[in-house]
């Protein structure tokens, strides 16, 4: 069962600002998550059905929300880890 991918408007703007290398790294991870989006270790506490993808080498985080009713993974925030701003943007 494969989920579809969507971006919130704000997340799409952030996606378009990313460099090619970071985008490719996120694309690979997102492709895996569309097959299995519910990764217990990536779940974010206090944000409902939200999960994160970490790019440790680049310092970026991507936050997505899973909707099981319609099989959609929605990217809601992308940004640097510093200061936790990406997690605040996801709320």
Predicted segments, located by residue:
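Compact soluble domain cores
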Residues: 21-34
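Short, charged low-complexity linear motifs
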Residues: 1, 46-50, 73
């Amino acid at each position: 069962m494969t989920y579809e991918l969507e971006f919130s408007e704000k997340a799409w703007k952030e996606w378009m600002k990313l460099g090619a290398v970071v985008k490719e790294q996120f694309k690979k991870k997102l492709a895996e998550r569309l097959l299995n989006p519910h990764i217990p270790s990536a779940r974010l506490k206090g944000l409902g059905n939200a999960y994160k993808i970490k790019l440790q080498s680049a310092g970026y985080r991507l936050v997505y929300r899973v909707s099981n009713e319609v099989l959609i993974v929605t990217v809601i925030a992308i940004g640097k880890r510093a200061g936790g701003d990406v997690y605040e943007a996801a709320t």
